[in-house]
Every structure is written in C-alpha cells, then in structure tokens.
C-alpha cells in the first residue's frame, strides 16, 4: 500500500505542476491584452467578446447565425428550455431573426467522450456546452484544449471583477445535494453528520461511479477546511458514539499520513470509508426523493439534490412533510451536504462562437436567461444580481416555487448553505490534485451490497 501511494504521489506532483500552469483553472483563453498570435480563431473571438455588453454580443450573434442551426450539449436538459428564450431575446432586437436548435444530454458521463470526439474536427458540431464535474473538466477538457472559458463582461462586473482579472471557470449555477430523512417516526433523528455513517445506516445515494460529482464530494472531504468540519462534528458526539467510530478513525491515521493529508485527514478518511461501505446505490435522485416522502420509508435517509422536493405530489401516504432537511434542524452538527457547479464553455472549434458567447452571457446576466434553472429551489445563479432578482421573482425562501410551502421547501439560499449549512463545495483544482491518490484509495473500498 505504502509503495503504491508513493508512486501515485509522484505522479500527482508532476500533474499538479502541469495543472498549475493554467490561469487558476480558467481554461485556455488569455486576457484581451495578451499576445494573440498563438490563439485559435475561437479564442480570438472570445478575447474580443469579453470586452462587449450583452446587447453588443446579441448583434454579433444575429449576424452570425440567422437562419442556421445551433447545437449545444450539456449535463442539464434545461439548455433546451433556455434556448427558445434566447431566440426571443434576439428577435426583440431583429424580428427577422430565425434559429433552429438541438440540445443533447448524454447519459452515463458520456459527455466527455462526445466532446473529445467532436473536438477532433476542424469545425465542430457543438457550439458550446453546459457541463459538470470539475475534476474531469480540468484534466480532459481544459488542459487538452477542447473547451475555452468565456467570461462575460457584465457578469464579471456584477461580481466585482473583470474578465481579465477573473480566475477560474464560468459557473452558471451552484447546485446542492443535501441530507434529508424521513420523519414519520418522531423518535428517529439525525442531529450529526456522523449519524449517517453509524452502524446499520444505509443512506440512499447515487453511486459514485455513475455520477462522478459524488466522488468529487468525497475528494473534497479530505481538504483541510472540510476535514475540520468532520472533526468538529465528531467532537460533539457522545462518548458512546465516539467509541463506535474511534477504531475506524485510528485505523485511518496511517493512510492519511501516506496520502499527505492534514491533521484531521483521518476523520475524513474514516467518514468516507464508512459512507462507501454503507450507502445504498440508487440510479437517480428522483427515485430517492420518491422513496423518502412516502410514509412507509420509516427511518430512511438520503443524500440528494435539493430541488427534487419541489415536485412532490401529495397523496394520503406521500407528502413533502414526511421528510426533513437535516441541516435545517436546531442543533444539527457537521456537513449539510455538498455543492457542485454547472460550468459554461465555448468549444474551441465552435461553428457559431459569437452566438455561443451571446447565449452564455444571456444565461448568466439575465433573470429570463437563468429562469430555466432559477424557477426551482436549490440552484443558485453565480451572478449576485440575477440571484437576488430570481429570489424576488420566485420566492424560494418562502417555499412558493414548490407544490407545498413548508419548512423543507423554504430554501435558505446560497449564502446560508455555504455558511451555516456547511456545504462541501467542489473545487476542481483540488479534486484534480487528489484524484490519483485519494481517488485510488477510494477505489479499493468495499461498497455495500443489499441482501
């Protein structure tokens, strides 16, 4: 084990040096002031586009794509809902504008293969993408030159920066997956994140090999900030509860040292091991939600995307009132779940780069552009102005965007979740840096198999 880890650490040191050459994980597009001799044609357009307003970009898009077909691909199907609104916006500028479109949503993490194959063409099929999983984006898409980052000027200004100064990918939104539990049995509660990995618990969760952002969540737990969350929550357990977990924590100390983790790394590895050993894999978050809200799901819990509670259909046995959000309960200790982003990129061989830039700006700079996602709770625009106006329009904090307004559906918002809610927030660069070490360690863990 030790020899294996030393080899993997050497690999990671080399890769980290390579990854660190990018502008904070921000893709291949330099600031407009830099030398553009070595830029692709799309990168040159992006550099110019980053100096323009949405209206200016819209006029470029109309000129470029009128009468053509726009192809997009994404992890979210809602790009298909956003495109007609974008077209209506362009038609408000030029009523003669027409655009056909097709939006694809590959399953089973095939989006990376699809974009890689399309990237081999001189001119690609896909104009842009909406994509998740920061680790694979960094290693497979950005460092390989398949995707380019475009930072809209007015989005940057809303965030108090400029396209030139901003470092990182462009997030459309942050989504949260949170711990929820069936509360039909009033004697069964979860008041500490270690309760979810206690003896006999089997949380419902999308398998980490089918939805990789779940694996990134486990990577992130080893980062000092989040390992400290787990240690602090552990300290709040009773002596009896600690006695159950302590042997696992102690057993992880050596591995934590060999993996180069911080002082609380053994607590992170212990939680990860117990979680992987116990979670009950489910194919999608929808079935998890449907299970938990049924009165028959006594003493069950899950880690699932928050937005699913919006659409629960009330019956005699099914109700959103049958579940509680763990982090919302008084006295709850530890992590409330995890957060990841949907990122927007222009393909480096985009057939319609101006239109792609305009569409990206529209989604990140306007409430209407974000509304395909913003109409539901649990998804937070990366533009603070759009986020504020989205809340004013849909009233997520009052539960009014769900079928039933109650404590569970009253979204406390992004700031609360990343603060008091202690969400574990995905960091693409950190995930990439530990994917070969912590990732290989996780691969060797035994998964739970229901009898």
Task: List where the protein language model places each region.
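Positively charged n-region of N-terminal signal peptides that target proteins for export
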Residues: 1-4
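Hydrophobic core
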Residues: 13-17
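Bacterial lipoprotein signal-peptidase II cleavage site
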Residues: 18-31
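Extracytoplasmic "Venus flytrap"
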Residues: 32, 43-54, 64-84, 342
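Conserved C-terminal helix/tail region of periplasmic/extracytoplasmic solute-binding proteins
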Residues: 41-50, 55, 406-451
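Extracytoplasmic ligand-binding site segments that recognize negatively charged/polar headgroups
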Residues: 68-88, 101-114, 124-287, 313
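Extracytoplasmic/periplasmic substrate-binding proteins
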Residues: 267, 277-349
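Mature extracytoplasmic/periplasmic domains
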Residues: 342-419
């Amino acid at each position: 084990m030790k020899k294996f880890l030393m080899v993997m650490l050497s690999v990671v040191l080399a890769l980290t040096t390579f990854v660190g050459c990018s502008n904070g994980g921000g893709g291949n597009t330099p600031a407009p002031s830099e030398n553009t001799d070595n830029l692709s044609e799309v990168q040159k357009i992006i550099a110019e586009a980053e100096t323009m307003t949405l209206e200016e970009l819209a006029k470029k898009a109309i000129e470029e794509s009128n009468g053509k077909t726009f192809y997009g691909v994404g992890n979210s199907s809602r790009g298909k809902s956003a495109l007609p609104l974008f077209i209506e916006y362009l038609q408000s500028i030029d009523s003669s504008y027409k655009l056909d479109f097709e939006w694809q949503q590959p399953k089973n993490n095939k989006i990376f293969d699809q974009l890689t194959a399309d990237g081999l063409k001189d001119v690609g099929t896909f104009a842009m993408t909406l994509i998740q999983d920061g680790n694979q984006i960094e290693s497979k898409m950005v460092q390989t030159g398949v995707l380019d980052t475009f930072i809209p000027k007015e989005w940057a200004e809303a965030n108090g920066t400029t396209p030139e100064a901003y470092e990182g990918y462009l997030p459309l939104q942050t989504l949260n997956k949170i711990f929820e539990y069936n509360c039909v049995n009033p004697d069964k509660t979860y008041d500490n994140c270690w309760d979810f990995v206690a003896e006999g618990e089997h949380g419902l969760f999308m398998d980490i090999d089918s939805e990789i952002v779940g694996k990134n969540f486990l990577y992130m737990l080893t980062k000092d900030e989040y390992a400290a969350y787990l240690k602090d929550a552990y300290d709040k357990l009773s002596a009896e509860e600690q006695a159950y977990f302590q042997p696992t924590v102690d057993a992880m100390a050596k591995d934590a040292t060999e993996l180069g983790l911080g002082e609380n790394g053994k607590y992170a590895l212990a939680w990860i091991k117990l979680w992987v050993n116990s979670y009950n894999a489910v194919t999608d978050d929808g079935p998890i939600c449907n299970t938990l809200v049924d009165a028959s799901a006594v003493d069950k819990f899950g880690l699932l995307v928050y937005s699913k509670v919006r659409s629960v259909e009330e019956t005699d046995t099914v109700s959103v009132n049958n579940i509680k959000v763990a982090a919302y309960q008084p006295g709850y200790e530890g992590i409330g779940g995890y957060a990841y982003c949907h990122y927007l990129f222009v393909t480096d061989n985009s057939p319609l780069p101006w239109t792609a830039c305009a569409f990206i700006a529209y989604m990140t700079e306007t409430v209407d552009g974000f509304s395909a996602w913003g109409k539901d709770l649990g998804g937070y625009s990366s533009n603070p102005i759009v986020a504020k106006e989205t809340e004013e329009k849909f009233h997520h904090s009052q539960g009014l965007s769900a079928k039933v307004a109650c404590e569970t559906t009253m979204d406390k918002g992004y700031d609360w979740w990343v603060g008091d809610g202690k969400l574990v927030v995905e960091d693409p660069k950190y995930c990439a840096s530990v994917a070969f070490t912590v990732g290989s360690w996780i691969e060797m863990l035994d998964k739970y198999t229901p009898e």
